[in-house]
């Protein structure tokens, strides 16, 4: 005798469904034509439901009631004489309530074949548009399309506020060929919390955050959040058009590196972060007033541990909750652009943390990482390394880079820890790593990924800047990919940074023995397109602030720091300075507290801040300081061998017709009168800038603004002049005829 169950569920499908072992649920639940083609059958699984009716969406009429097949919550029934599928609601009677929902199992697959191909191939640039949680309109019905990559999972369900976190309620459709799971859910609200519930190959169940979530809960919670439907209306067309035609390797770039959580805080005890509106009102005017060209944001992808500063993100697509939502971040970038300020984002693609709700063994297998810890584990940070050879992982990362550039209008990415990506033996002892196919230590898969990434991003987003934090001598980081380079636009000059800060920390009396630490960088300055960076890494972990590194009394510390900045701004290469360094913060950076803005009540700190502002204005006003940054013709030593006096003199050149600039840097407290220097052209010169001016807190020694040229050749120049070189100072001299281009000091 046929029972209620086997009248609608064949071959034990009902038992398999109840036990969570029926993975092809879309072939069973929802609306289907009967085997004889003469009727429609609707099946559903609704725990605790008492009664279920099928309602036509078109006319709102009740079509049929479903039979309760068993007490577990299986319902099924035929649709009378109807044989043509139609859109319907389920009217569900519970013990204490009645609700109506659109049955998600009546919808077919929504994934596009081209998207699936590109995702698997490793070249998808918009995977976030079909993976994760995306608002869709299907046959006039609005809802959220959930999709996740989990090829080895036995079952995947989406659970959340909308289904009481019931893993049996919304089991997803499996695409066997590519490992994707999807479901379209109407009746989901903006801001709903959700996760993916996965049954691993060994039968264990684990709830995971959505790898493509665009919003997440704050720690210690870790649910993903359905995004808002509202979109930001961009007003930065002028900037975007200008950016697209700007050759940044020839343009001034003075980048202000910012940790949004500690630049400034609010609250009675500084316990609250500034939100994006606060940052629009405070950070942007400050950066503009200081004449920086760009802001670089330390990572803002969602991260659970404050002490990671964002460098161990779990939600790579989700702007952190700390400062506001995605629209708030877009408004901040938009406001920066309207103020003519570019915004670069720190991007972490070298590794990811082991937080159990994250990517680690996502479907019960090493999906994003390598199985072998000799390739998959980062020894320094106890994190996991992406499997750059897997197409889907490449698409995940490529799409994420595109996501920040396309959806948030960021002007470039600074890729963190590139060195750890390039070498298989990075921070490993012999026997702790596996060689590549040719027996070498280069990570060929990571190299290929970086080349592909840079090539595609520069092609898709004209005028962006791709910046590498790379600390080794790996050749060709900024060479084009068609010349076998990695294709970055710029590379941090870690050698210059280490040498110059080492020099800075020495007593002036001993600097003569370390003169090469400031001159050696010019031996390799044109091998890459370098960026001179003094970043957050140099003012933490007991290293002290820049001011703290310098020996001597306060006057010497401040004077030396001003001279150092002058040398940095005169040296070929773009500039990056971490927040707080521009006003000589005394204590090393603490991410838990605001910068010490109260120091600006004191003249020495005001002087350094004013000096940086004037350096930036000179930098932007004089093309000789940027247009030939990466060509030897843009720089010439006048004297690089005066170690006994610790004085450095050089010329910066621009294109034909551009005024040259002479830099004189004295790194001892000695004053030099009647000091002869060569001049790059005939005619008198003036002091464009003098770091020893009283305006900056100096002793106000110098040349009264004017340097009189003499027809005496010197240092390979036809003209020369006798000047006064102030103590611990930087002088910037330029032709009198061009002094209107710069602020005269």
UniProtKB/Swiss-Prot annotation:
Keyword annotations: Carbohydrate metabolism, Glycogen biosynthesis, Glycogen metabolism, Glycosyltransferase, Transferase
One GO term describing the cellular component: cytosol
Keyword Protein biosynthesis appears in the UniProt entry: no
Catalysed reactions, as listed in the record: Transfers a segment of a (1->4)-alpha-D-glucan chain to a primary hydroxy group in a similar glucan chain
Catalytic residue positions: 416, 469
Pfam family, one: CBM_48
Known EC number: 2.4.1.18
Sections of the chain in a coiled coil: none
Pathway(s) of this molecule: Glycan biosynthesis; glycogen biosynthesis
Alphabetized GO MF terms: 1,4-alpha-glucan branching enzyme activity; cation binding; hydrolase activity, hydrolyzing O-glycosyl compounds
Entry's Gene Ontology BP terms: glycogen biosynthetic process
TM ranges: none
Entry-linked InterPro entries: A-amylase/branching_C, Branching_enzy, GlgB, GlgB_N, GlgB_N_E_set_prok, Glyco_hydro_13_cat_dom, Glyco_hydro_13_N, Glyco_hydro_b
Keyword Disulfide bond carried by entry: no
Gene3D superfamilies for the chain: Glycosidases, Golgi alpha-mannosidase II, Immunoglobulins
Xref: SMART domains: Aamy
Family: Belongs to the glycosyl hydrolase 13 family. GlgB subfamily.
Subunit note: Monomer.
Function text: Catalyzes the formation of the alpha-1,6-glucosidic linkages in glycogen by scission of a 1,4-alpha-linked oligosaccharide from growing alpha-1,4-glucan chains and the subsequent attachment of the oligosaccharide to the alpha-1,6 position.
Protein name: 1,4-alpha-glucan branching enzyme GlgB
